[in-house]
UniProtKB/Swiss-Prot annotation:
Enzyme Commission no: 3.5.1.5
Example of a GO MF term: urease activity
Listed pathway(s): Nitrogen metabolism; urea degradation; CO(2) and NH(3) from urea (urease route): step 1/1
Gene designation: ureB
Compartment(s) of residence: Cytoplasm
Enzyme class: hydrolase
Main location: cytoplasm
Known catalytic reactions: urea + 2 H2O + H(+) = hydrogencarbonate + 2 NH4(+)
Record-given protein name: Urease subunit beta
Matches recorded under CDD domains: Urease_beta
A biological-process GO annotation: urea catabolic process
GO cellular-component term (any): urease complex
Gene3D superfamilies: Urease, beta subunit
Amino acid sequence: MIPGEILFADEPVAFNEGREAVRLTVLNTADRPVQVGSHYHFAEANPGLEFDRAAAHGRRLDIAAGTAVRFEPGIPVDVRLIPLAGARVVVGLRGATGGALDA
C-alpha cells in the first residue's frame, strides 16, 4: 500500500446490517440548518428539531461513521435510527441522559 492510497472493495460494504431500526420524521423548527453526526445520541439532538424523542432514546442515525445529516429549516426529513451499541453509556452532550441508557 502506498501512503494516501485508497483501496476499493470489489463488493458493496454493508454496515449496521441486522440492527433493529426505527423510522422517524424530523422537522427543523429553527431558523438555521442543524447537523447531527452519525454517533450522536439522537434523543439529545438540537431542541429546534421536532420529533418523537422517546422513540429516539438510546438510538443514533443509521448512517456511515463520521458522516452527518443536515436538517434544513421547515423541511421534514425521514430518518432511520439504530440502537447505540457497546456499553450504552451517554455522558455530556445536552445532559439529558448522563449515564447508562438501560438503567
